[in-house]
Structures are given as structure tokens and as C-alpha cells.
């Protein structure tokens, strides 16, 4: 269970395709006409009038930020400048309206009233520096119109049959890995690098009037409200003088502009070092993107421009904003901040970690705001996403699950998708159990399951007749999987002859939790039992009736071996109590006698067994010793030969002990994240892990940070010398590791 709020993934491309394929249109609900006017105080009056042709969702939407393209059938923008006027035709002109939508409890969506989440992104009016005022007032009037008609827009959104997917656990949204930092951390990078433009002289001239803003910016800050593809920066003005065609005003405190830009990866010469790679990859730097149309490099979403006397009018501020628009679009390339460094197609020094090196890259962000609609810069997240091994993301977007840092409560995090975790951890873990050969194993990333694709011999077991017989599993009946963020081992229909010709069928299920614990002054991944096992047994009813006492005795022995980890001679009272329980649990279903031993039953049987803690420790040590001996036969590629497996399975032992020994090897392998390439072969490493777990001494075992170096070596943040020191680890829809960025083994003072 988790306390995360559900995450809603919006698929705008699928929404548009579905509506187009089914010829679904809702344009009949949009208003037919529009009208808006604005009366200036000194310079201009403006009027907007016309009729609508269509409103359409576009595939530019990201996350909960749809983009609505509103096309004008016919209309005009009338600008009056005292004695003169200009009438601009708007036939077939489109306006792109961006917004944020919030889900309601009744399945509908609403648009928050916060001004920065509702804005005009672009329009098709042909503009130049000479007529920016036309673009400004078209957008201003249109935005006022849309705000006055927000209920119509909400109705349009709610009728659009939006295709969504609700995700309870964390999701990388189709990406293989994600390297993330908080907005606050990114702002510390920006402040430290000091690469934002500081001094400005912004000028806008129109009809012999000139408006100038001259001053200095304080540190630019990444902030919330953008859709993921676009990134927003709050640009605080430290001090400025505003010259409004000869009238000069001084800026008051808390003046700022909120701008929005796109980012992109640029080719670069190699300037970073991946300590885990050969540094032969192609470097890309994530920077602000500039366009061919320099008037559209930067969007000013909103602003607060005030003077110390409070004398400037709204109209004055409009013209000042145009001056700043000119300046930002002309000078944004001076913002030389590199937000991330990536080495693409890098060769790992240790081949076993090649799967962590990016072969495709992207970026994204997600905003988190407080209950008071204030930016939560610690939980808001900026991410560099990647695909590895030439995998492809079939639904790529810049949307990011905004809950990652809310869960870790750290400044940085790294996520690995469950399909990768299955392929590179659990698959090897099941191979290491030596229950199965490499030829018999298959991974299903859709069900997050590793299983056997052929019938396998599980091992010899002594039956009630004193004979050593084979126990076997049919295809698909041995499973190691991820379920509800737990690693689950399951055996279904494990079958052998129990004696007197009776064939018994056992199911076994055990859940394990992957945690991160402080051991030997380092963070160590630990796979520990989550709860008691569940055991089920069935036999044909006719065989039960003919051999009940023998079957009950055999089932009791097997169940105790599964609970204790070995077959043992128990006191008569323990066997008697267990026998009564088995008989009481027997039910007849479709000609079969079935017995289900739940977790509560297992706890009672463990108690009734009379086995002391000292005896359990002895069993545990014995099983660890056997597991270590078995591990010596694992080759350096993590496999065991079929001949060796056959020899192991010929050694008779109780089913419970065979499972317990295999689990020792599974748990050792599943947490062996950072140990590859330490000069030992695979078997030796596994033995070290088994011994470390047995002795609770991890001094010779690499911590999780050795693995983290492999994860982030080719993906680095602006502070290239910092490393992610892991303090948090959890399976939560992804394998999530969180921590702090530290430099020279000391916390970064930024």
C-alpha cells in the first residue's frame, strides 16, 4: 500500500485520433460569435469582433495541459490610436490557448483560475517588431474573452472524450530510466553557475513613442506552471528605471517577469567524464532552444511591473512588456545555462552495466504546488529521461510523474522501469536459484514475470514409501514476479508421487520486500521476507479416501519443511496438532480434496512445531552453506550447466529445504547491484553476499552507491563533480532510489 495520490496520464494524441476516427465533433457547443473591447487611458482603444469556425484539441498537449486551437471564421481587430485607427482582418486566423485542467470527483474537469495556468501560447497573425502591439492586443483581448467564457471551454474539454490512464504507483511513462532533481536544486545550480543575463536595456518603439526599461535582474529561478515540454523561469528585477516616452519611473520591489522557453539537446564536444564508461559516447547538452522566428523564442506568461509611486497604468505596463519581449527574444541565447549533460551511446567499462547507458534521451518536468497554490520547489521535479539498449518509447512525451520526490523527500532521485528491473535483476535471480536452466527461462515484461517455458524437474524428494522420486513443474508454473511492489516467488502444481501411487500437488507462494538498510556504514539493498508463505495442496478425492492417514502425514511433513526450511523430526504433539489442522482445512471441490494453509495457519504451525530459535539458526546456517557450495558452480555469465543442475536435483532433500536454499541465492543475486566487475566471478560474488546476509557483516560488500555511479555516469547535472548519495530505495511501480547530491564526500553547500 502507498499514500500516493493517483497520477493521471493524459494521452492527447490518442484522444484526437479516437475522435477523428469516429468523426466525433463537439463544435456545435462552442459560441458562434465573440466580442471584446478594451479602453486604454492614454494611447489606444481596441475592439475584437468575429465568428468562430472551429475549436480543436491539438497533439501539443502535455500531461494535464491541453492545447486548444481556436480558428476564426471571420472577424477583425480594431485598434484606435487617437486620431488614427487600424483594422486588422482575422479571417482564418487561429489562436492556441493553453490551460491546466484539474480532475473533479465526478469525472469531469475544471480549469483553475490561476492566471499563469491559462494563457495564449501563439497565434497565426503575421507580426514583426514594428507591429508587436497588434499581437499583444489580439492575445490580450482573446485571453479576456476566454476567461469570461471559461465555462464554455470547460464544457468543450468535458465533451472531448479525453483518453486517460490512472496510475496508482509511480510511472516513468514509457521511459527506461529517469534522472531527476528538484526545482530548488536546479535553481541552486543556476545561481551558482551565474550564467543568466543580468543587465538589460529593453526598448519598444511605436508611432514615434519609445518605451525603455533599464536595469538589473536578480537570479533567475525555475518555477512551476509549465507543461513539461516548456520550462518557466521567474526573472526577478533587482532594480530598474522605466522610461515611458520621457516619463521616468523607478521600479518598486517584487517586480518580475515570468517567461516560458523550450529546451533541446545540442551536440557538444566532450567536456564531461563518465568514470564508469570509456568516454567514447556523443555528448549532448540540454540548453534553451532558439527558433528561426526570433519573436517566438520566449513567451512572457505574466509579469508584475510596478513603480514606486504607483503611477503607471495598465497600458504603460503593456508597452513595457513589449519592450521586455523584444529584449528576451534578442538576448535569450545569453542564458547559457546547461541543464543536463548526456553521453549518448557510451561504452560501459563493465559490460554487465551497458544496459544503463542511454541510447535515446529526452527531458521533462512536473510542477507541484501547495494547498495555497504556491510553488513547491522541493517536490517539483526536473528530469532527464532515457531509453537504453536501443529500446523505443511508443508514447514519448515530456510529462513526468510529479510524485517521485514527494515519496523520496530528497533533492534528487533515479528511477528504473520495472521491465528493466525484471530483465536485469529478477531474471538473473531466478537463474541463480538453480531451479532452472538458461534454456528454460523466459521473461514477460507485460506481466512482469520470469517463468519456465518448459517442464522442469524441481528435484528429488523422499516419499512415504522411502523412495526418492522426482518432483516436477509444468511450463509456466515456476514464477518470480513483481506484484504490488513486492518480489514474489510462486510454485504452482509442484507434483510428485507421495507414496502408494498417490500424486500430490502443492502450490507455494512467498513475498519479499526490497528495502535499503544501513549496514557496515553504507546503504545496502536487502531482500527480506514480507510475510509468512501461503501453501495449498490438492489430491484426487478417491485417493484421499483410500489413503487419508498417509496423505495427511506426508502433507504435514512437507508443510513443516516449507515453513522451517528443512525436514525435521518433530514431537508427536506438534504432528498431532498439525494433522488436526490439515484435516480441518480439507474441502472437496470438483472431485478433489483441497487444503489451503493461510498465513495465520503458518504462524500457528511455526509456533506449534516447538522448534527453538537456536535450531532455526542452525537450519539457516546449514542452508546458507549449501547455497554457497552450489553457487561455486555458477559460471561468470550467471548460468549453471544443465549437467550440474541435473546433479544437484538428484540429491534428495525436502521440498521446503530446496526452496529455502534457492531463496538464499535469489535474495543474494537480487541485491547484488554494485558488485559486478570487482575482480571476482559471479559465483564468488554471490557467495560473498550469501555469507554477508548470514553473518550480518557487509563490510566487504559494495553499497548501493557503487551501483548508482553506473546509473548516472553518463547523465550528469550542471554540478558535474557532485554524486547522488542514496538514502532511499523502494519498489513503487519503478525501482526508485533517492538521495542527496554530494561533492567531495561532503554535503553540497549550495
Swiss-Prot record:
Keywords: Lipid-binding, Virulence
GO molecular-function terms, A-Z: lipid binding
Superkingdom assignment: Bacteria
Induction: The toxin locus has divergently transcribed operons maximally expressed during early stationary phase. This is part of the orfX1-orfX2-orfX3 operon. A longer botR-orfX1-orfX2-orfX3 operon is also transcribed at lower levels. The crude toxin extract was isolated from cells that had been growing statically for 96 hours (at protein level).
Disulfide bridges in this chain: none
The keyword Hydrolase is annotated on this UniProt entry: no
Record comment regarding domains: Has 3 domains; the first 2 have an alpha helix wrapped by a beta-sheet and are structurally similar to tubular lipid-binding (TULIP) superfamily proteins, while the C-terminal domain is a mixed alpha-helix beta-sheet. The N-terminal domain (residues 6-168) folds very similarly to P47 (residues 35-175), another protein of the same locus. This structure is very similar to the OrfX1-OrfX3 complex from P.bifermentans (PDB:8BGM).
Homology family: Belongs to the TULIP P47 family.
Primary role: Part of a botulinum neurotoxin type A2 (BoNT) locus; may be part of a progenitor toxin complex required to protect BoNT during its passage through the host gastrointestinal tract. Binds phosphatidylinositol (3,4) bisphosphate, phosphatidylethanolamine and phosphatidylserine.
Oligomeric form and interacting partners: Part of a crude toxin extract that includes BoNTA2/NTNH, P47, OrfX2 and OrfX3; OrfX1 was not detected.
Protein name: Protein OrfX2
Naturally occurring in which organism (per UniProt): Clostridium botulinum (strain Kyoto / Type A2)
Amino acid at each position: 500500500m502507498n499514500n500516493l495520490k493517483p497520477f493521471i496520464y493524459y494521452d492527447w494524441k490518442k484522444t484526437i485520433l479516437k475522435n477523428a476516427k469516429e468523426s466525433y465533433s463537439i463544435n456545435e457547443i462552442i459560441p458562434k460569435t465573440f466580442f471584446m473591447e478594451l479602453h486604454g487611458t492614454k494611447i489606444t482603444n481596441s475592439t475584437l469582433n468575429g465568428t468562430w469556425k472551429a475549436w480543436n484539441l491539438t497533439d501539443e498537449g502535455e500531461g494535464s495541459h491541453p492545447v486548444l486551437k481556436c480558428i476564426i471564421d471571420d472577424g477583425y481587430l480594431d485598434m484606435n490610436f487617437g486620431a488614427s485607427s487600424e483594422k486588422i482582418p482575422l479571417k482564418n486566423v487561429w489562436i492556441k490557448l493553453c490551460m491546466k485542467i484539474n480532475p473533479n470527483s465526478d469525472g469531469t474537469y475544471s480549469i483553475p483560475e490561476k492566471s499563469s495556468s491559462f494563457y495564449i501560447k501563439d497565434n497565426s497573425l503575421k507580426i514583426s517588431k514594428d507591429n508587436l502591439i497588434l499581437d499583444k492586443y489580439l492575445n490580450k483581448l482573446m485571453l479576456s474573452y476566454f476567461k469570461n467564457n471559461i465555462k464554455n471551454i470547460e464544457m468543450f474539454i468535458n465533451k472531448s472524450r479525453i483518453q486517460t490512464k490512472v496510475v496508482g504507483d509511480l510511472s516513468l511513462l514509457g521511459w527506461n530510466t529517469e534522472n531527476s532533481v528538484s526545482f530548488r536544486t536546479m535553481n541552486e545550480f543556476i545561481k551558482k553557475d551565474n550564467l543568466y543575463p543580468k543587465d538589460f536595456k529593453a526598448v519598444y518603439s511605436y508611432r514615434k513613442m519609445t518605451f525603455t526599461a533599464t536595469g538589473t535582474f536578480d537570479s533567475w529561478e525555475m518555477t512551476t506552471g509549465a507543461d513539461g515540454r516548456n520550462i518557466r523561469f521567474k526573472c526577478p528585477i533587482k532594480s530598474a528605471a522605466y522610461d515611458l516616452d520621457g516619463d521616468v519611473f523607478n521600479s518598486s520591489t517584487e517586480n518580475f517577469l515570468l517567461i516560458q522557453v523550450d529546451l533541446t539537446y545540442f551536440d557538444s564536444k566532450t567536456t564531461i567524464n563518465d568514470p564508469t564508461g570509456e568516454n567514447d559516447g556523443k555528448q549532448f547538452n540540454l540548453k534553451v532552444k532558439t527558433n528561426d522566428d526570433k519573436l517566438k523564442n520566449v513567451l512572457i506568461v505574466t509579469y508584475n511591473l510596478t513603480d514606486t509611486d504607483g503611477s503607471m497604468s495598465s497600458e504603460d505596463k503593456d508597452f513595457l512588456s513589449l519592450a521586455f519581449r523584444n529584449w528576451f527574444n534578442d538576448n535569450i541565447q545569453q542564458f547559457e545555462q546547461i541543464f543536463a549533460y548526456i553521453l549518448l551511446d557510451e561504452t560501459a567499462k563493465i559490460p554487465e552495466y551497458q544496459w544503463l547507458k542511454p541510447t535515446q534521451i529526452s527531458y521533462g518536468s512536473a510542477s507541484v504546488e501547495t494547498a495555497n497554490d504556491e510553488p513547491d520547489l522541493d517536490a517539483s521535479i526536473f528530469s532527464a529521461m532515457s531509453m537504453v539498449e536501443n529500446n523505443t518509447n511508443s508514447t514519448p512525451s515530456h510529462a513526468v510523474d510529479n510524485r517521485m520526490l514527494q515519496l523520496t523527500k530528497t533533492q534528487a532521485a533515479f528511477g528504473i522501469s520495472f521491465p528493466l528491473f525484471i530483465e536485469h535483476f529478477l531474471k538473473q535471480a531466478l537463474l541463480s536459484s538453480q531451479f532452472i536452466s538458461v534454456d528454460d527461462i523466459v521473461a514477460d515484461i507485460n506481466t512482469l514475470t520470469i517463468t519456465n517455458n518448459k517442464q522442469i524437474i524441481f528435484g528429488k524428494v523422499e516419499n512415504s514409501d522411502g523412495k526418492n522420486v522426482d518432483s516436477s513443474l509444468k511450463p509456466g508454473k515456476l514464477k518470480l514476479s513483481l506484484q504490488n511492489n513486492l518480489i514474489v516467488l510462486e510454485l504452482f502444481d509442484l507434483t510428485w508421487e507421495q507414496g502408494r501411487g498417490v500424486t500430490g500437488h502443492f502450490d507455494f507462494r512467498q513475498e519479499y520486500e526490497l528495502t535499503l538498510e544501513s549496514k557496515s556504514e553504507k546503504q545496502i539493498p536487502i531482500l527480506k521476507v514480507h510475510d509468512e508463505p501461503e501453501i495449498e495442496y490438492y489430491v484426487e478425492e478417491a485417493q484421499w479416501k483410500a489413503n487419508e492417514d498417509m496423505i495427511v502425514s506426508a502433507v504435514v511433513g512437507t508443510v513443516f519443511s516449507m515453513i522451517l526450511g528443512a525436514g525435521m523430526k518433530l514431537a508427536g504433539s506438534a504432528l498431532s496438532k498439525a494433522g488436526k489442522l490439515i484435516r480441518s482445512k480439507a474441502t472437496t471441490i470438483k472431485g478433489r480434496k483441497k487444503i489451503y494453509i493461510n498465513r495465520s495457519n503458518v504462524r500457528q504451525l511455526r509456533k506449534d512445531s516447538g522448534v527453538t530459535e537456536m535450531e532455526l539458526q542452525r537450519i539457516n546456517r546449514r542452508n546458507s552453506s549449501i547455497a554457497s557450495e552450489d553457487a561455486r558452480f555458477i559460471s561468470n555469465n550467471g548460468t549453471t550447466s544443465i549437467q550440474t543442475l541435473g546433479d544437484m536435483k538428484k540429491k534428495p532433500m525436502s521440498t521446503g529445504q530446496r526452496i529455502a536454499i534457492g531463496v538464499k541465492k535469489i535474495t543474494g543475486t537480487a541485491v547484488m547491484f554494485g558488485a559486478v566487475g570487482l575482480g571476482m566471478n559471479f559465483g564468488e560474488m554471490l557467495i560473498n553476499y550469501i555469507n554477508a546476509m548470514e553473518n550480518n557483516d557487509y563490510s566487504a560488500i559494495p553499497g548501493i552507491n557503487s551501483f548508482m555511479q553506473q546509473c548516472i555516469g553518463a547523465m550528469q547535472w550542471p554540478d558535474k563533480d557532485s554524486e547522488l548519495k542514496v538514502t532511499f530505495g523502494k519498489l513503487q511501480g519503478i525501482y526508485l532510489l533517492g538521495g542527496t547530491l554530494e561533492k567531495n564526500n561532503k554535503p553540497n553547500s549550495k
